[in-house]
């Protein structure tokens, strides 16, 4: 079996309900048992609330950078990073980090939404609805210099017909 670095990201990034962190807390011990690894818990849950993308980006900056750092550390050590997170904003730092280490990687984005909004196109202001666009460099989150080339991304399960995501 591949050596796995299992990380449970418990910090709030753009959660609008308590469900995402509860999901991480429920899955982490189960995945850890299955992999024979104790998950490393990062952060503590914040109070879920509705905030604009720029507020969430500012408030979750440390968690997002830590998520990218966990991927960096795992790949540098020759380990497979497995991150459990409650929502998509972590893609802002994790996906570009993976592509820096493994440029031949193809991202399979399995989501009901494309998450390809930008600050200029979002109708809801939800940071998670902008995650893939930010990772691909369609807008600058100010977190990481590298971006994911759009031709390295495959969308699957997008239920909105490929239109920009509307989260609400």
Spans of features found by a protein language model:
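Conserved alpha-helical scaffold segments that buttress catalytic/binding sites
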Residues: 2-168
């Amino acid at each position: 079996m591949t050596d796995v670095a299992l990380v449970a990201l418990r910090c709030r990034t753009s959660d609008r309900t308590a469900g995402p962190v509860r999901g991480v807390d429920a899955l982490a011990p189960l995945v850890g048992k299955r992999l024979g690894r104790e998950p490393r818990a990062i952060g503590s849950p914040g109070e879920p609330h509705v905030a604009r993308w720029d507020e969430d980006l500012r408030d979750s900056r440390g968690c997002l950078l830590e998520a990218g750092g966990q991927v960096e550390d795992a790949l540098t050590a020759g380990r497979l990073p497995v991150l459990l997170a409650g929502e998509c904003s972590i893609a802002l730092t994790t996906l570009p980090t993976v592509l820096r280490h493994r440029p031949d990687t193809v991202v399979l984005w399995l989501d009901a939404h494309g998450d390809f909004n930008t600050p200029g196109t979002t109708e809801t202001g939800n940071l998670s609805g902008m995650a893939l666009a930010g990772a691909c460099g369609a807008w600058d989150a100010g977190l990481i210099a590298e971006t994911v080339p759009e031709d390295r991304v495959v969308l699957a399960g997008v239920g909105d017909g490929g239109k920009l995501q509307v989260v609400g």
